[in-house]
């Protein structure tokens, strides 16, 4: 009698992953998160919530270049004796700017050109002295009698030249959504600092169009943003009921905030005395337009804009009271940067899993 083959049913159990592989995978994920944390922590420290740089010199002093010791601001005598003009590199309504040399180092010498605007010039000097921090160009010296100011030189110039700079081969690696968003964060950090400065709430008045805004800021060689021009920085004092007006002329265009425009229509001629004052929320209105310039049109910038859509919509609220504070905008920008960096890092981790 022929025996029938006897088939044994075998259950195929799920394939087990060796515990050592899981441990290595978990370690890799933890290491990735640790590195990300350290990077973001270093980044936030570089921006800092502390207004004054820990390495900043005492009031009336400066540290220049790699020199560790602090030196007193240069006096009239020292400027006249030690600073040599090289060439004129700019001229505005208030002052002329000269690339100069001091002890074989490039510096910037600014001189008043219009005596009628000396109050603006001296106001700018006062602000520069009082607001020395990681957000403000470094003051090296001044001479009130001769209306001259000496500051640190930044070869990349104002933010107006940002896109041209990013197309230079040396800096093309910086032309990413990540670096551009960091510049926008720097800019908002400056606004937040001015709104909570040691002097009180200051409004950046020299900002009636995008080009004018960009001209007020410098791009440093390590790609950070510094405010450079503080000639028009009035103080808001709510407790005293004091608001501000940016100049005495009628302002036009969508770039300036609605409350900065003449509210009584074209049939009523503009009169400065009838123009209502306003507060620092005019600066908030302009943030989306300035940030849009920073973000440019590189790969990934549209994703950043999408994540910033809600906060930018809030910045554009017609009622100034409904707009966020500069601190709220800054917090949102930082959260978006953290989120996008995590998303950029996680795809590799998901594939490992």
Residue positions per predicted region:
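Terminal C-lobe "cap" of eukaryotic-type protein kinase domains
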Residues: 318-344
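Protein kinase catalytic-loop region centered on the HRD/HxD motif
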Residues: 189-208
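Activation segment/activation loop of eukaryotic-type protein kinase catalytic domains
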Residues: 205-268
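ATP-binding glycine-rich loop module of kinase domains
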Residues: 73-130, 136-138, 144-146
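Regulatory extensions appended to serine/threonine kinase catalytic cores
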Residues: 342-353
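Conserved C-terminal C-lobe helix
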Residues: 301-318
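Conserved structural core of kinase catalytic domains
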Residues: 138-183
